[in-house]
Amino acid sequence: MADFNKVGLLTFLDGRFLLCRKHNLASKLILPGGCIEPGESVDECLTREINEELGEVALENVAYIGTYRDMAASDDPSVEKIVEIQLYGGDIIGEPVASSEIVELIWFGPDSDVQQLSPILVNKILPDLIDRNMLTWKI
């Protein structure tokens, strides 16, 4: 059983995908999205979290990609928790703007620093996207 059940969004622009950094600049990069609240559908959660984190943007062409499970990103290396992410791909309509809970938005590409990524991105999500030819560059 996962300690955190989340919904995440994978969106591309010019061959790069959008990631965010929460809390502080030392935090790992994660996908936009968040935890599903009690009684909330996956669609409702994704829409709410994207608006909370990226501002008033709209989502189009949203489609399920897969469910991934791995160690949760943590600023404290002694904390070991499991996160499960239901990942959806989609297009953002509008300009994403970092909210109060996000300190930085990054369009991550082949020249970006992989060491900044959360464990689930490095270990599970990106290898799967490469295997499925959804990501054309190697990490």
Regions found by a protein language model. Name each.
Residues 13-16, 23, 91-95, 110-112:
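Short loop segments at secondary-structure junctions
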Residues 57-67:
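A short coil-to-beta-strand element that immediately follows conserved catalytic motifs
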Residues 69-96, 110:
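Active-site-adjacent beta-strand/loop module that shapes the phosphate/pyrophosphate-binding cleft
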Residues 9, 46, 64, 87-88:
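A structural signal for short, well-ordered beta-strand segments
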Residues 89, 97-130:
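NUDIX/MutT-family hydrolases
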Residues 13-56:
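Conserved Nudix-box catalytic region and its N-terminal flanking loop in Nudix hydrolases
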Residues 36-37, 70, 112-113:
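Short histidine/acidic/glycine/proline-rich micro-motifs that form metal-
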Residues 1-17:
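Conserved N-terminal beta-strand and adjoining loop/helix that marks the start
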